[in-house]
Regions:
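His/Asp/Glu-rich metal-coordinating catalytic cores
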Residues: 20, 57-221, 225-230, 234
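Accessory, non-catalytic peripheral segments of nucleic-acid enzymes
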Residues: 244-397
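N-terminal active-site segment of His-dependent metallophosphoesterases
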Residues: 1-66, 70, 147, 378-397
Length: 397
């Protein structure tokens, strides 16, 4: 075995077309292939996947076959794949029973297979995604059944944590809940947040004011997603390696290669557009050279480009759009500079306010806007949403 005993990743969302309604394909598969190859090269004992490996809307066999191929390749190298479920996977997960090299870490497996999920002196436990009302029971169960002390335990979870995502999504638990039941864990690995985040200082103020002032906070690793699945996500993606050095758990991040991403500086004047037209292909060619240098597959080489421009330049921006053409997947966002005292709110004046007029007043990504427009214009939004889901499933085959 090598210096590292585990490779950690999360939120693969394996499917051929990673984005909802853009023909952007291959990204999640390419990330998974890198994870498998890197784990074998480094000679880890286990690969840990912290949920949302697959996606509920994907009913075809392609993603499952791709996942199984990777698990079998790891198994042939003597590497076990340890996983939990996120909220994006079906609960039955029949694929898991197809490989002797994949181990479901959820609580029943913790109790039954503990000897086979120890690595480098640590026991690795896991809890599938839980609704908020179930989380306390699951944490209590793990706390009661662990065979190792907390500081020699790695716990894998997948939750919408209030401390991290409370303003963006409906929280399904608090990180302080884990601190309360399992203080001083060797490491808490958590999925769902598509941003990489590491907290390595275990001593500090309590996350919950009701906890004692000297409470020992857990070390936390959020691997983030393995490829961009939204233009609002961070472009940098990672897998992480774990090692045990003198009894201490060390974390090292390793960059995942991915589709080139060009985030153009804000375009506020016609002169900015002229500069952009002159400079675009230089930047584009640099991105292609980088992709070629790192042997990025051809289907991953077409870059993502995000342009934000002043709303008064809509007509001029069309010239830039024509220049870019099919050389990149482009994302355009009109941006009206706000007064410093202006609040983040939408004001629609007039007596004839409609859903359509409200939608045009809200800033959102183009794919989200298109789906919203379909639902608004449909006589039966529920049936329209089902049709849209079926379209996404068909596109992934």
């Amino acid at each position: 075995m090598g210096d590292y005993f585990a490779l950690v990743a999360s939120d693969l969302h394996l499917k051929k077309r990673t984005w909802s309604n853009r023909p952007i394909e291959g990204d999640s598969y390419f990330a998974w292939e890198q994870i498998v190859d890197r784990a074998i090269a480094v000679e880890v004992e286990v690969v840990i996947l912290a949920g949302d490996i697959l996606d509920k809307q994907i009913n075809g066999s392609g993603p499952i076959v791709k996942l199984q191929e990777g698990i079998e390749k790891l198994g042939a190298a003597g590497i076990k794949t340890l996983f939990i479920q996120g909220q994006h996977e079906y609960q039955e997960m029949p694929w898991a029973s197809l490989s002797k090299h994949a181990i479901h870490l959820h609580r029943n497996v913790v109790a039954a297979l503990a000897p086979s999920i120890e690595a480098a002196g640590y026991t690795i436990a896991g809890i599938d995604f839980q609704a908020k009302e179930r989380l306390q029971d699951e944490l209590s169960y793990v706390a009661e059944t662990l065979k190792y002390p907390p500081d020699k335990t790695i716990l894998v979870m997948h939750q919408v944590w209030e401390e991290w995502m409370g303003e963006r999504a409906l929280p399904q638990g608090k990180l302080s809940d884990v601190d309360n039941w399992l203080p001083g864990l060797g490491l808490l690995i958590t999925g769902d947040l598509h941003e990489s985040h590491v907290e390595t200082e275990p001593i500090g103020p309590p996350l919950d004011a009701s906890l004692p002032a000297k409470w020992r906070r857990n070390k936390i690793l959020s691997p983030g997603s393995t490829c961009m699945q939204s233009i609002s996500e961070p472009e940098d993606k990672y897998m992480y390696f774990l090692s045990s050095v003198d009894g201490s758990l060390e974390i090292k991040k390793n960059t995942l290669l991915g589709r080139p991403f060009i985030d153009w500086p804000f375009i506020g004047t016609v002169a900015d557009i002229e500069d952009c037209i002159r400079e675009y292909y230089t930047v584009y060619e640099d991105s292609q050279s980088h992709a070629e240098q790192h042997s990025i597959p051809a289907e991953i080489c077409k870059p993502l480009v995000r342009f934000q421009y002043d709303h008064s330049l809509s007509g001029d921006a069309h010239r830039l759009e024509k220049l870019v053409g099919d050389s990149a997947y482009t994302f355009w966002k009109e941006h009206a500079p706000k007064d410093n005292n202006e609040e983040d709110s939408v004001v629609v004046s007039g007596n004839n306010v409609t859903m359509e007029s409200l939608l045009t007043s809200v800033e959102c990504e183009e794919d989200v806007r298109q789906v919203a427009e379909r639902l608004i214009s449909s006589g039966d939004p529920y049936e329209e949403l089902k049709r849209w889901n079926n379209e996404q499933a068909d596109e992934s085959h």
